[in-house]
Structures are given as structure tokens and as C-alpha cells.
């Protein structure tokens, strides 16, 4: 039955900002859905508040709204655009919740909009735990013993039945937010209190513990004629008790017998039938008790998910695209499989002749005080995927693709340490981010497979694989490089050993292993991901490396090629913005007739989609892997400036190996990043910088600090996302920093800068082609200098800076671009204090602001710069004028503090945000208000505000207090702030700080007295003292600001209505022309 003709236009709901548990896999699914539906001739309307996505590019949909995904805003869009249908299965939990809310509020009925892809009833049946349990019983499947609670009393009654340990999960939240495992009553009450607070329906599901059981997932697609296929089976390497998003996973499932697999396959199809999913993809999760084989259904998601992105990349089967077409009435047998060039229909189940491993990437080092043990609440921020012919090869490739400094199973503990065994046992039993390496250490320390199994519950089959690799490592260390004869080296490479790891084991340099491979002519071949285990010929070049005989790469010899190196796994400081740039580079160069080659290993992204580039190599972005691809493809140029720090780190080594790095030269990049060389350039150009020094010892630092003056910003050289960067206020602070943080720099020096307190920070993105410098955009930060630029909200155009100051910056950017010989993108950061412009830093590469600026101005910077790198001047492209839009765009960040209880949510020079949203308005206030709504802030228009500010802010706080009064707020203040306000004739209610007696601030926050808090501090002591204010505000969902500038922006936004007017990107850009 072909597509529906009763609908003409479809509204797709996006997933909003990137948060832990919902990352860029939804940009991938949303972008695919837009393409698939427009291909069928539908008018597509898209709403997504995240500007760093490909799906919000103006050419992806007919009308694109970068607006908050909030039912009232979406109602405005529906009223204006009048879609016939809404597709909510592409935007994760955010989109599902929004669709259900639109249904509940009667919006869909009011405007006659049909929900496609999933019915409200099916979503509710899958998400509502009680209905789900009843449905499973009906088809003869077991679920965990459980109960549902809406209050603490009910929860305790359920716990009495289920017993401890038990697992608590709030309904309608994602990434396991607010859930956890309770081993006793005290922990139980704490988790339930948090869960009741986070669940939009105030509902908790309390389950018997299945900890230690094996966990499996099935990716299923079903159409309305009841054709059902399993796209992929996924097995969790880690047992139940660790959220599947934080588990290492393997596809296809490795330890099921055929009979067990068939039982699970049939069960998952039965689940989709019963829940009523008949137009799209779902994932069904199972737990199996390894002792007796008891099978339990854990849950099902009636939408495209993180696992379906993984399954799509693992098999080459585009689940989101197929799901979008099924949603408009097609059946599986009517759709053709792209990868085989239409030789097979989409109703053929993919079969694969390789093994895929996914490993999550964590960022605990950014959250001092966070609990870094893995539980049922998801904490990872990204993931890496690797493909190999065996489990061992795929696992070792994934370990090196993770970019955490490991080249394979590098040891974590020294076996000479008397505490070694205790530490290993602790890490195995209570898993953290590095357990996989401790397993290898356990085998080195003499534990048996059973010994490790008893501590971890990881299937013995996986453990045997790791043990074998450890024994091989011992052999390499024993025989050294002379013992690496051709056959032995081939065996090692087949098992996924990296040159760098072998070099470390044999005690030689990596280059020597490479030389040895050249002597033996030992190189990888490339195999294709083709959905059919090489049964049919394939047109798409989607490749992975392995050490076998036959190479299927078949590179072209008649076309000019350009290779783009991606950014690897997402992490804080290097996220979707960089992937966005890589995709744009590929699209632009394809349009210009080049053959484009993408190298990346992140399964969540659009860059690793098989039709983004002409050729895709799903490989770790390391020197060894990239050089092997260059050897076979021989590209005319390689782009390293777009994937963040990952490919940049390789620039020099690639150049040294004779690889043509295009754009800004590695030497110019080094001139900008190396402190001393940069200093010389700045002095030549006579630009101002904050007083600074480079030091290599504690004593030297103490001396220099006296000359520069406190406060100081201290950091190691060469970092992204401000790792190990801090503001120190006195000598004791400085000494503590050197003792605790400086080990990051591996004998590299530490930089000291005088900290410009209260300066306004500004970001400028520009493109230089050697002749002309194009200013992409000047963004004024809302938080003052000292907050990492990636964590600060910003406005384009600037909202307080004078024209003169902006012109000074334009001139300085131009001088720097020419001095550093930039070819392509560059980003410059300035600080403005007392009308003086200070240069903070220059990055001759794509910055994380590029997507935001492109959306705000309508100039696709990443595309323009990619063409510049390939030799096309700005004049030839007709892009030489800076665009200053007639409206305001505000970028606001999203922070993951709710996942890390115990971490102080104070913003500082270390970047901690995971994602961003954008708000657009006729005024700064309207744009800022929209950005706040988009980032799920809890800003209220009136109520009671608490003011508690540091010495340096006391003059300006009077003005803020007056604005809040005018808005109708009642005011409270702490002692020092109250005195200043009193002198100005404003009399707030006085409140006690925590150590001044009760009722104090924290009591009042807990009692729900405040709707807004502003709390600014400086100095380590004051920061520690006021931490409980910030933590309580976060916990009780009170909107708070930790900078005075943020407070003023909030006060302005209170007058604006964020839900009143919606504007599409296409309408915005039309205003510019």
C-alpha cells in the first residue's frame, strides 16, 4: 500500500539540546526523517531549539523553527503552519513528552492534526509502567516483580514487597534520570525523593533487582501489514545494574544459543504487536538470568533511540529513514535498501559478517565531587564504535578510538604496588568508567576467569577474549621487537593491536613498528558494511579495516579527493558543533565536484551516515589508522581543523609523513597554540594582552604571580574545553593547584594570566583566504570573563558594546588572520574592560560557535571556509561582507548538574555544558527569554527573589534590585547585601546565611519561598560557603544566576513573552537580504 495522500504537510519534533542520555543521535534520525519525507513530496515543518544540528539547516525542511520544544510554543507553530500530521518518534523522550502534552491539551484535536509514527495510546502503553506490565502478562512474557508509587508512603509499602536491593525509576524521564539502586532504607528514601521530584507524572516504578543478569536489546521495525524484522541484536558486555547507555555493548549478540536468540526474536515481535507499534522502529530490552535462563522484558521504547542509531551504523540499515516512510503508509516490502543499490527490499533482515563494539566516553574529571560509579542512571557523554572481524579486533579498535590516552589494554595499576590487588578487586566489583582496563590488570595480577566473573558478572566468553590478549601482550614484552616475525605480527594485528601499543610493549618507538610492517608489506584491507554479509554487490562505500586477504575498498583513481577527519566520540568541550562543521565541509566539497572521504568513529553523528560523504571509513581517528587510509586513497588534501582537538593533535605528524594538510598550516596552528611563539606575534602587532607568564615549577609560579598580581587564571598549555583550568585568588590557592592539578601537562609548562575580573568577554568567528578577512559574527557573552566561553550564554549582535569597540576588534581579527596566515576558519576571544580591548586567545580552527553564527546570520561559515581551504577565494564565492542581522539571537547552554548530585553548579573556567539552545527575538530580551525556555530553565515572572552578592558587585546590585521590585518581586537579602540596598532606600527582608542560625537560606529554599536567586562569590572560602545555596536552588528547581550580568539579562527577559511569537529560520534569513 503506497504512501498516504490525505496528508500534505508534516511537523517533525526535534530533541532539543544535547543532554546526558539524549545526544546527537537524534540529529541523525531527525535529519534522515526530513530527507525521507521531502523525497516523498511532503511539506516538512521542523521544530528544534538546538542550533548545532544539521536538521535545523534551512535547506533540510520547508519551514524550520529554532524555538523551544514546549507545547505552548509548538501550538503557535501549528496554528501558523497548519500541518496535517505530527511525527514525534524522531526526537527522543523530549519529542514524545511534547506530543503527549499537545494531545492532552487538546491542541492536536483543535487543529485537526494526526499523530503518525506512533499513536498516543501506544506511547502511553509503552511508557506507563502499569499498563506495560499488564500488556506483557497478556502475551505470556514476564516483567520484573515491581510496584508503582506516587508518594513516599506508597514507595515504602512497595519496597516491603519487592525487598532490597531494588531499582527505582521515575516515569517519563530519560537516561535513567533520578533513578538508582537502593541497598537499604536510607538510600531508598533519598532516591525516591529525587525521583518523585523529577518525574513529570510524580510516579516511580520500583523493581526487584536484576543486578548481575545479562542484558540484551533487539532493534525491531514493524509495518502496518505486520511485517516485522529484527535489524540487529545487541548484547551488553556489562551485566544489569549499569544503564545500557553506560555499558560496553556488542552487536550482534555473542553469547546466545540459536534457540535462545529465536525465543528473544519472537518475544520482541510479540511486544511490538501488543503495544501497537505498526509504523516504525522500537527497541526492546531483555534481561536473562544466567543461572537458570529466566527471561524478563525490561522495557521498550516506541521510538528511534540511541540504540537504533548504533544499530543503523552497525548494520548499514537506516532505521530512522525507513521508520519515517513507514509512518506515511509504506510497507517494508515496498521500500528498497539503499546500501545494496535497491537489489534487496527493506524487508530483508540485515546479516553481518563482522563484530561491532561500542564503548561509552565519560567526563568525570570535569565534575569534582561527583560519584563516578556506574549505576542505573546514565552518566556518559559520548560513545565510540569500532568494527572488526573478531570480538578482540573490534574491542581493541574501540579502546584506541575512545581517546582517553589508551592505545589498547594499557595497565592502570602497577603490580609492584602492595595495594594493587585490593584496588583491582574494588574496581571490578563496583564499576567505574575504567573497569575494562582493570579486568586486564586482574589477569596480569593472576586472577582466573572465574575469579573475575564472580566480581563482575561479565559473561566468561568475553573474559576469555581479554585474558588471551593479556597473554599475547606478555609474550610481546618477552620477545621484544626482534621476536616480531611476520607471522606473529600478522596474528597480533588481526587481534586489533595498535602499533603504538606493540611499541610500548616491545620498548621501541611507534615508527619502528610501522617500519617493520612496511618491510613485511603488512597493511590492513578494507571491508564494506553492506547489510547482507557480502551476498549482494554494494554501491555505497562504507568501510572498516581488518587484517585479511581481500580488499574491497576499490578507490577511484580519476577524481580529486578531499578527506575530512572527524572528532571521534562526543565529550564535554568537543561535541556536535564540530561534527556539524565536518558534515558541512563534506557537503560543500561534494557540491564542488570533489570526492569526499569521511573518517570518524562516532556512531551518533550525521558525519558517519553512509550518504553524507562519497566514502566513509568507520575507523578510530589515530595516526596509524589515518595514515593507512591515506596510503590507499591518496587524497589531494586532508582537513584537520574541523573535528576539534582530535584531528588537530595529528596535524604535525601527518604533515611529517607527507600527508597534504590543507587550510591553515600545522605550523601556523602551532604558532597560535604555543604560548611563546604567540606572544611574539602579539608583540609584533602591538596588541594588548592581560599580564601573563609561563612557568615550569611551583617556586617560579609564586614569584611570577607576585609580579602579575592576583587573581590569576592558571592552566596547562594545549587544552580544549578548559581542562584543569582554574582561577586562583592567593598564594595558598596557587600552591594547591600545582599539587593537585598540574600533573595534566606531562612536563609541559603552566600558563599564568592576570584575571580580568568583571570584563565583558567577546567571541569573534572569521574566515580568511589570504586576501580578505570575513567577519562571521561578533558575539557578546552574557556571563563576564572567567566563565568558560563554552558555558556562557552569548548574543549576536552584541547587546551592550559600542560600535567603536566592535570596530577595534574587527581590525585586530584582520591583523591576526594575516599574521598567522590563516586559510579557513578562525575564532578570536577578547575581553573588554574600561573600554580597553584585551586579546585572550586565537584558535585557527572551527570553533563551537560556528553553527550558531551560521543560523543567526544565514551564512554557512563551515561550507564557505571548506571551499577556501580547497582553493576557492571568498571573492569567487561572493561572500565578503559581514552580515549583521536585524534581530537578536541568543545562545544559552545546558548543564548536566542534575546528573551529578554533590557537584557545585558554579560556572568557572572549566567547561561543563553538554549542549546549547538558541532563542531568536526582535529584542535582546525576547531572544534571551526564548533561550531560557528552550534550556528548560524554571524562570518565573514574579514571586520572591534572594540577593546575595560579593563585594565587587555591591554597587551594581542596587540597580538590579530596583528592576526586580518594578517587576513585582519581593526581595530578601543576606546581611552585607541588605546594608547596601538599605542605604539606597530599598528594604529587603534579612535572611541568615547557613552558619548564622535558623531559619537560614537553605530552609527557605526547601520551603519553596523563592522563585529567583542571585548569588555571586569570589575567593575559595566564599565559594565553599555558598555552595549549598547553589546546590539547593538546583535541587528545588529555583532559577538562579551566579553572575551579576546574568542577573541583569534575566531581569530584562522577565518583561518579554517567550511564547508569543514564532519565526522560522527561512523568514529570519529573508529579513537579512
Curated annotation (Swiss-Prot):
Top-level taxon: Bacteria
Co-factor(s): Mg(2+); Mn(2+)
Residues holding Mn(2+) 4: 841, 843
Binding site for Mg(2+) 3: 829, 841
Residues of the ATP-grasp domain: 133-328, 679-870
InterPro entries the UniProt entry points to: ATP-grasp, CarbamoylP_synth_lsu, CarbamoylP_synth_lsu_oligo, CarbamoylP_synth_lsu_oligo_sf, CbamoylP_synth_lsu-like_ATP-bd, CbamoylP_synth_lsu_CPSase_dom, MGS-like_dom, MGS-like_dom_sf
Stretches of the chain forming a coiled coil according to its record: none
Note on domains (UniProt): The large subunit is composed of 2 ATP-grasp domains that are involved in binding the 2 ATP molecules needed for carbamoyl phosphate synthesis. The N-terminal ATP-grasp domain (referred to as the carboxyphosphate synthetic component) catalyzes the ATP-dependent phosphorylation of hydrogencarbonate to carboxyphosphate and the subsequent nucleophilic attack by ammonia to form a carbamate intermediate.
Family: Belongs to the CarB family.
Name used for this protein in its record: Carbamoyl phosphate synthase large chain
Annotated source species: Escherichia coli O6:H1 (strain CFT073 / ATCC 700928 / UPEC)
Gene that specifies this protein: carB
Amino acid at each position: 500500500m503506497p504512501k498516504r495522500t490525505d496528508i500534505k504537510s508534516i511537523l517533525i519534533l526535534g530533541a532539543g539540546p544535547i543532554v546526558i542520555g539524549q545526544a546527537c543521535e537524534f540529529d541523525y534520525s531527525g535529519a534522515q526523517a526530513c530527507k525521507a519525507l521531502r523525497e516523498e513530496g511532503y511539506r516538512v515543518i521542523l521544530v528544534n531549539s538546538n542550533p548545532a544540528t544539521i536538521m535545523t539547516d534551512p535547506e533540510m525542511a520547508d519551514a524550520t523553527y529554532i524555538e523551544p520544544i514546549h507545547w505552548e510554543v509548538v501550538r503557535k507553530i501549528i496554528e501558523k503552519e497548519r500541518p496535517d500530521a505530527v511525527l514525534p518518534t524522531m526526537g527522543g523522550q523530549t519529542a514524545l513528552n511534547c506530543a503527549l502534552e499537545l494531545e492532552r491539551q487538546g491542541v492536536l484535536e483543535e487543529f485537526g492534526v494526526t499523530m503518525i509514527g506512533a499513536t498516543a495510546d501506544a506511547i502511553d502503553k509503552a511508557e506507563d509502567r502499569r499498563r506495560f506490565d499488564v500488556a506483557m502478562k497478556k502475551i505470556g512474557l514476564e516483567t520484573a516483580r515491581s510496584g508503582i508509587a506516587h508518594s513516599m508512603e506508597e514507595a515504602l509499602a512497595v519496597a516491603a514487597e519487592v525487598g532490597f536491593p531494588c531499582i527505582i525509576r521515575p516515569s517519563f524521564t530519560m537516561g535513567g534520570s533520578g533513578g538508582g539502586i537502593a541497598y537499604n532504607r536510607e538510600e531508598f528514601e533519598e532516591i525516591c525523593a529525587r525521583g518523585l521530584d523529577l518525574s513529570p507524572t510524580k510516579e516511580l516504578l520500583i523493581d526487584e533487582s536484576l543486578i548481575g543478569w545479562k542484558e540484551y536489546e533487539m532493534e525491531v521495525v514493524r509495518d502496518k501489514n505486520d511485517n516485522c524484522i529484527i535489524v540487529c541484536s545487541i548484547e551488553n558486555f556489562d551485566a544489569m545494574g549499569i544503564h545500557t547507555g553506560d555499558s560496553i555493548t556488542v552487536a550482534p549478540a555473542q553469547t546466545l544459543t540459536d534457540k535462545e536468540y529465536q525465543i528473544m526474536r519472537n518475544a520482541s515481535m510479540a511486544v511490538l504487536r501488543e503495544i501497537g507499534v505498526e509504523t516504525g522502529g522500537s527497541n526492546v530490552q531483555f534481561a536473562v538470568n544466567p543461572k537458570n535462563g529466566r527471561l524478563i522484558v525490561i522495557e521498550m521504547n516506541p521510538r528511534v533511540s540511541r540504540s537504533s542509531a548504533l544499530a543503523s551504523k552497525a548494520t548499514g540499515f537506516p532505521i530512522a529513514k525507513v521508520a519515517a516512510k513507514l509512518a506515511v503508509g509504506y510497507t517494508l516490502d515496498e521500500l528498497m535498501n539503499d546500501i545494496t543499490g535497491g537489489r534487496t527490499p527493506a524487508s530483508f533482515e540485515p546479516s553481518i559478517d563482522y563484530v561491532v563494539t561500542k564503548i561509552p566516553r565519560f567526563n568525570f574529571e570535569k565534575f569534582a565531587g561527583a560519584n563516578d560509579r556506574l549505576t542505573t542512571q546514565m552518566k556518559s557523554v559520548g560513545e565510540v564504535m569500532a568494527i572488526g572481524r573478531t570480538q578482540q579486533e573490534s574491542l581493541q579498535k574501540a579502546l584506541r578510538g575512545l581517546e582517553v590516552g589508551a592505545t589498547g589494554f594499557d595497565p592502570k595499576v602497577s603490580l609492584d604496588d602492595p595495594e594493587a590487588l585490593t584496588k583491582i578487586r574494588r574496581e571490578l566489583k563496583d564499576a567505574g568508567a575504567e573497569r575494562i582496563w582493570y579486568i586486564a590488570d586482574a589477569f596480569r595480577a593472576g586472577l582466573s576467569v572465574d575469579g573475575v566473573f564472580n566480581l563482575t558478572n561479565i559473561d566468561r566468553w568475553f573474559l576469555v577474549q581479554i585474558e588471551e590478549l593479556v597473554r599475547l601482550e606478555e609474550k610481546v614484552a618477552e620477545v621484544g621487537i626482534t621476536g616480531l616475525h611476520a607471522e606473529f605480527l600478522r596474528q597480533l594485528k588481526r587481534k586489533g593491536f595498535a602499533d603504538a601499543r606493540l611499541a610500548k610493549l616491545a620498548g621501541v618507538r611507534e615508527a619502528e613498528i610501522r617500519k617493520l610492517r612496511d618491510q613485511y608489506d603488512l597493511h590492513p584491507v578494507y571491508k564494506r558494511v553492506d547489510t547482507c554479509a557480502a551476498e549482494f554487490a554494494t554501491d555505497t562505500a562504507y568501510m572498516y579495516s581488518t587484517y585479511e586477504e581481500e580488499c574491497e575498498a576499490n578507490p577511484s583513481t580519476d577524481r580529486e579527493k578531499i578527506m575530512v577527519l572527524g572528532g571521534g566520540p562526543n565529550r564535554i568541550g568537543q561535541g556536535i558543533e564540530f561534527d556539524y562543521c565536518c558534515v558541512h565541509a563534506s557537503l560543500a566539497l561534494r557540491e564542488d565536484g570533489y570526492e569526499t572521504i569521511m573518517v570518524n568513529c562516532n556512531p551518533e553523528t550525521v558525519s558517519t551516515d553512509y550518504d553524507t560523504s562519497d566514502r566513509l571509513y568507520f575507523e578510530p581517528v589515530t595516526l596509524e589508522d589515518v595514515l593507512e587510509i591515506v596510503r590507499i586513497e591518496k587524497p589531494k588534501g586532508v582537513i584537520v581543523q574541523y573535528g576539534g582537538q582530535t584531528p588537530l593533535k595529528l596535524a604535525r605528524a601527518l604533515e611529517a609523513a607527507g600527508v597534504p594538510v590543507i587550510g591553515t598550516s600545522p605550523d601556523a596552528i602551532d604558532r597560535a597554540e604555543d604560548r611563546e611563539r604567540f606572544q611574539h606575534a602579539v608583540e609584533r602587532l602591538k596588541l594588548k594582552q592581560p599580564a601573563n607568564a609561563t612557568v615550569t615549577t611551583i617556586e617560579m609560579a609564586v614569584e611570577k604571580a607576585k609580579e602579575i598580581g592576583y587573581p590569576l587564571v592558571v592552566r596547562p598549555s594545549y587544552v580544549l574545553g578548559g581542562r584543569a583550568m582554574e582561577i586562583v585568588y592567593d598564594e595558598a590557592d596557587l600552591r594547591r593547584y600545582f599539587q593537585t592539578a598540574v600533573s595534566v601537562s606531562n612536563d609541559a609548562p603552566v600558563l599564568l594570566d592576570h584575571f580580568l575580573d568583571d570584563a565583558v568577554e567577546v567571541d569573534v568567528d572569521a574566515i580568511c583566504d589570504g586576501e580578505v578577512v570575513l567577519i562571521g559574527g561578533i558575539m557578546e557573552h552574557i556571563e563576564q570573563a572567567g566563565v568558560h566561553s563554552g558555558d556562557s550564554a552569548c548574543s549576536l549582535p552584541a547587546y551592550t558594546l559600542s560600535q567603536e569597540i566592535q570596530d577595534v576588534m574587527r581590525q585586530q581579527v584582520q591583523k591576526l588572520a594575516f599574521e598567522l596566515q590563516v586559510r579557513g576558519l578562525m575564532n578570536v576571544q577578547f575581553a573588554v574592560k574600561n573600554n580597553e580591548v584585551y586579546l585572550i586567545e586565537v584558535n585557527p580552527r572551527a570553533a563551537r560557535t560556528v553553527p550558531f553564527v551560521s543560523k543567526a546570520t544565514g551564512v554557512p561559515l563551515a561550507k564557505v571556509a571548506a571551499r577556501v581551504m580547497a582553493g576557492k577565494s571568498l571573492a569567487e564565492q561572493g561572500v565578503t561582507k559581514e552580515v549583521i542581522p536585524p534581530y537578536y539571537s541568543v545562545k544559552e547552554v545546558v548543564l548536566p548538574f542534575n546528573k551529578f548530585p554533590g557537584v557545585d553548579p558554579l560556572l568557572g573556567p572549566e567547561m561543563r555544558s553538554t549542549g546549547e539552545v538558541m532563542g531568536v527575538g526582535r529584542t535582546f530580551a525576547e531572544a534571551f527569554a526564548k533561550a531560557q525556555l528552550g534550556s528548560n530553565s524554571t524562570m518565573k515572572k514574579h514571586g520572591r527573589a534572594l540577593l546575595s552578592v560579593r563585594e565587587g558587585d555591591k554597587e551594581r546590585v542596587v540597580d538590579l534590585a530596583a528592576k526586580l521590585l518594578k517587576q513585582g518581586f519581593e526581595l530578601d537579602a543576606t546581611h552585607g547585601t541588605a546594608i547596601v540596598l538599605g542605604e539606597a532606600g530599598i528594604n529587603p527582608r534579612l535572611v541568615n546565611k547557613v552558619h548564622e542560625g535558623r531559619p537560614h537560606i537553605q530552609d527557605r529554599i526547601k520551603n519553596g519561598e523563592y522563585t529567583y536567586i542571585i548569588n555571586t562569590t569570589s575567593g575559595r572560602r566564599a565559594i565553599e560557603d555558598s555552595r549549598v545555596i547553589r546546590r539547593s536552588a538546583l535541587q528545588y528547581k529555583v532559577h538562579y544566576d551566579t553572575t551579576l550580568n546574568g542577573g541583569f539579562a534575566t531581569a530584562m527577559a522577565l518583561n518579554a513573552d517567550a511564547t508569543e511569537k514564532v519565526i522560522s529560520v527561512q523568514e529570519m534569513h529573508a529579513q537579512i537580504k
